[in-house]
């Protein structure tokens, strides 16, 4: 998976975005305890809808790769 979104792909956009973030986590570009980019930043960077960005981040949380810290944001989980 590349670092860009292919809007013509049969793979849903939120899954592509989650894959990009997952790769950044696994490759150490987003190390443990680092805050994930905000939804606004994801929308701007990848030209996706806000709901798409939220769904991608939720996937990472469900996979145990990210966690929400109330009042602070979403961070890469150290156990990733």
At which residue positions do the language-model features occur?
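Extreme N-terminal segment that seeds HTH/winged-HTH DNA-binding domains in transcriptional regulators
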Residues: 1-50, 55-67, 72, 78-80
């Amino acid at each position: 998976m590349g670092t860009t979104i292919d809007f013509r792909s049969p793979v849903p956009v939120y899954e592509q975005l989650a894959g990009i973030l997952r790769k950044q986590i696994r490759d150490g570009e987003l190390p443990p305890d680092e805050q994930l980019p905000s939804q606004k930043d994801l929308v701007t960077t990848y030209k996706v809808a806000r709901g798409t960005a939220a769904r991608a981040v939720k996937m990472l949380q469900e996979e145990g790769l990210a966690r929400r810290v109330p009042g602070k944001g979403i961070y890469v989980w150290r156990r990733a």
